[in-house]
């Protein structure tokens, strides 16, 4: 977390537009195998989060003792996180900017699928101050967001909303990286972000449990999680406007997040309800060389990491696709004899919220004198092909069949096609009708 304006030296910043910015959902995201969304948020393994912290600590130790903007330790931290996400199936974009004469980096990771017009973002700053490794500030938030993203991959989660994760550079110089990202988003892309969740310092050694009160829906989501644990929360005031949610909020994007305290002092009342030591700072090593692996409270880190996942699973679900919405094309399409090219019959789907279900129904009615000649595919709006029929059925005529397709990685709205090809000579037919039901 950066110092407030009154408590830090003014950061002299020179922006330079460099490289691509990750403003939009990539046009063609290669989705992993489609699986049904996990029914409940997962427990994020504390050991995994701490393993990421250990890696960040080692990176700092090998690069002058810190992971600050413009230093080798920061770029190595970005490379570590990016490698994990690339291996897990995310589409990553490295965004560059210039501040204080040095190149800075933001890392954006998009999870395939979800409604591209309704994006849920979660992020944290990855840089430290120059005086230390920054394990709580903000290795803790960065590691929790990373492990939650990896949990999304492990679950094959396909929520209604599109999921995007961000790791920001040069936060400690005045929110430079996140400002750069937001300022370079076109207005249309900003409008697609339904919420941004920020996690900055969530493993403080003398922790409190603070919830941002900016957006009421996001705030209540976190409060519901902690109520389920029987842990009271307070509204976060110490870092208000001092972390990477501020540029999003200033752009009119709903924001929320968690915080476990920095250099404010824990009161007796707070110690009574949360434990810990009253009269001491929530983090006595804030912006100091002692912000190391020993500067983490495991209970706070574990609870807050689980809260990150709870919010992603809950807020990402959005409004489920109403069952039973059907779209049909009854126009005849001739299927020419081999070796002619395949033919397609389109259906335009609109007004459906989110993704197609894992049990998408496709009803096919093809009149043909030899169905064993036919290859029939469902082609999704993004071009993904789902094979329905591949030359089976022998010499029987006509293909009248209902298929169940796991299309949960596909946005429902758009143009779907039934594609049919005759692969052998002497028989002909036509597509009589077909229907897709969500």
UniProtKB/Swiss-Prot annotation:
EC number: 3.4.24.-
Signal peptide: 1-37
Span of domain P/Homo B: 321-438
Annotated catalytic residues: 171 (proton acceptor)
Transition state stabilizer, annotated site positions: 286
Any one GO MF annotation of this record: serine-type endopeptidase activity
Main location: secreted
Keywords, in A-Z order: Calcium, Disulfide bond, Hydrolase, Metal-binding, Metalloprotease, Protease, Secreted, Signal, Zinc
The protein's name in its UniProt record: Leupeptin-inactivating enzyme 1
Record organism: Streptomyces exfoliatus
Top-level taxonomy: Bacteria, Bacillati, Actinomycetota, Actinomycetes, Kitasatosporales
